[in-house]
Amino acid sequence: MEEKNGDAKTFWMELQDDGKVDLMFEKTQNVLHSLKQKIKDGSATNGDYVQAMNLVNEATLSNTQTLEKGMFITYSNPEVNTHRSNHTPVTQSEQENKSSAVPSASCDNSCPKGCTIPSPGKKVFLPVKNKADNLVKKEAPLHISFHRHICSRTCLMETPLSLKGENPLQLPIRCHFQRRHAKTNSHSSALHVNYKTPCGRNLRNMEEVFHYLLETECNFLFTDNFSFNTYVQLTRNHPKQNEVVSDVDISNGVESVSIPFCNEIDNSKLPRFKYRNTVWPRIYHLNFSNMFSDSCDCSEGCIDIKKCACLQLTAKNAKACPLSSDGECAGYKYKRLQRLIPTGIYECNLLCKCNKQMCQNRVIQHGVRVRLQVFKSEKKGWGVRCLDDIDKGTFVCIYSGRLLRRATPEKTNIGENGREQQHIVKNSFSKKRKLEVVCSDCDAHCDSPKAEDCPPKLSGDLKEPAVEMNHRNISRTQHHSVIRRTKSKTTVFHYSEKNMGFVCSDSAAPEDKNGFKPAQEHVNSEARRAHEDLSSNPAGDSEDTQLTESDVIDITASREDSAPAYRCKHATIVDRKDTKQVLEVPGKKSQEEEPAASQSQQALCDEELPSERTKIPSASLMQLSKESLFLLDASKEGNVGRFLNHSCCPNLWVQNVFVETHDRNFPLVAFFTNRYVKARTELTWDYGYEAGATPAKEILCQCGFNKCRKKLI
């Protein structure tokens, strides 16, 4: 430092001896005056802006004045030096000794338009404009260095006024964290992501992020707000120029994040339905305290399976099921699902004494956090897409609807069924003509107690009436629970002994000698035609109140005589014998395949996912229970999950999660991403239809992948 000070002193002494000190300052003043005029009249270039910013940064102005319009980013190594005064210049020798770091994609689109990124050899400060940055911020110099200290609450900057509606991965940036892509060393060719905290500390993985949030007692940032995936970009959310948002929030504030609706195809609106994000009736106060088999009292975020009883419960059931992979830890990993758990995930419940904010075993109970948009596609009807990049294992939404119970199920003989089928087929064509001219209003609203209290209308021909679930119907006995999808425009009943579905598990195993029946998760191939039928079904249509015309996703618990500790009872199954329905979508032309997806996305589909390696044949499905059939009806009430489309190479997993009860008959059906999903990509899941099961009623698939099964239903 003394040598550097001596060099500076020698420099000015030489100028003084030559009588050029005044000349040097006059030149500096001329430069400042020129920059001032260019900035005022708008003729300044990006280089002029950067030069002026650096000069102001080195001047004697206060930091609040220099940071009033934005933040500063330095592309030098964040670990060099201690806290440096903003007035101290940086010499060339210091810059040469610093290793470069490549800025994260989160900052790429934040610079002014046309701004060029400086070379790593120079230290340049660039203003970063944060989108929707209408907050009152504290001073946040991003060239801060790390002082060895014990992190606490004082390490965090002021909490933003509001974080609702933001990209969840952008929230750390809003809170003055830096997300950087950097090389581990000069010889490395791969980039890695790290975060730099407001106090200068580097976070290199999720474990370090978790411990930092614990140490600082942060209650507004969580582990799922961070992503170390180099493919994830934080600002790739630019909408199309011709996009017109018809509804800013179809949930009407029910969800913590707005879910807009956009139609770029025509002027049709969403069907009228009641938006609900729960399956339980709102007018009843249900007591779930006696429906939990265990609870925890963790104080360190429920991350240690040796201490957390809820994690142990998930692992115990997964280990007892032969469909689970050996050697892998069951459950979430820092609030992200890395693989499917056939036996279900047991989240921490209301009896647990752990911190609800820092608990890593509470995910879906926090609700939708990613930004979604309902839109209309050219061939597949209504669909859902993400507005931001989503990392693998991220929770998207649940499948919600109205919980009903089918009472006194009766079998209909084949002769009567044939006559009923003929009658319904005839009615379907007249109904088609009526539905073609009817357009429902896009009037999604929240549940009302009066609507919940009204029983559904039942047709006189309905052999299996359904009644709504209430607190008197719910018990812990073994039941056969079903999730019902929204109706299609035309529903045809038929009798079929064949079951179908796809297995959401790692492998298949037959019944063992002890009578153990493995858990099986099968998704109804008839359960996902909401996007094609909802646009023409007004809420007040009396024909639509026939509950047996809804698509069904069957979630059942098998009845084994084996010990409870070795049971793997939970399953999601479709039984065509019980549903007795075939969907026929009128008003649709013969479907044509869309162009194949990009090679990178196709490669992900060509490689079999662990959950799709083995399919259990229909003959080995479990015998459905004939008692107390529970239905989850989304035809009139539901959430954004009712609009999710099918794909033979889906980007969503279907996972059963137990939150409000440990009763195996009442899981929540949750959707998680099974890979990285780029912004504005449609979110899909596999309906699991077996091609050839019902050849007369099959519909062509529209997913467009090379390994497409070609048939949707």
UniProtKB/Swiss-Prot annotation:
Biased segments, Basic and acidic residues type: 511-534, 579-592
Chain residues that bind Zn(2+) 2: 296, 310, 348, 352
Record: residues binding Zn(2+) 1: 296, 298, 302, 308
Localization (cell): Nucleus; Chromosome
EC number: 2.1.1.366
KW Metal-binding (keyword) present: yes
A GO biological process held by the record: methylation
Primary location: nucleus
Region (Disordered): 78-109, 511-549, 579-608
Pre-SET domain boundaries: 294-367
Sequence intervals crossing the membrane: none
Residues the entry annotates as binding Zn(2+) 3: 302, 348, 354, 359
Biased composition annotated in UniProt, kind: Polar residues: 87-109
GO cellular component: chromosome; cytosol; nucleoplasm; nucleus
All residue ranges annotated as the MBD domain in the record: 161-233
Domain SET: 370-688
Source species, domain of life: Eukaryota
Pfam families found in the cross-reference section: MBD, Pre-SET, SET
Catalysed reactions listed for this entry: N(6),N(6)-dimethyl-L-lysyl(9)-[histone H3] + S-adenosyl-L-methionine = N(6),N(6),N(6)-trimethyl-L-lysyl(9)-[histone H3] + S-adenosyl-L-homocysteine + H(+)
Family named by the database record: Belongs to the class V-like SAM-binding methyltransferase superfamily.
Role noted for this protein: Histone methyltransferase involved in left-right axis specification in early development and mitosis. Specifically trimethylates 'Lys-9' of histone H3 (H3K9me3). H3K9me3 is a specific tag for epigenetic transcriptional repression that recruits HP1 (CBX1, CBX3 and/or CBX5) proteins to methylated histones. Contributes to H3K9me3 in both the interspersed repetitive elements and centromere-associated repeats. Plays a role in chromosome condensation and segregation during mitosis.
Domain notes: In the pre-SET domain, Cys residues bind 3 zinc ions that are arranged in a triangular cluster; some of these Cys residues contribute to the binding of two zinc ions within the cluster.
Protein name in UniProt: Histone-lysine N-methyltransferase SETDB2
Species whose genome carries this gene: Mus musculus
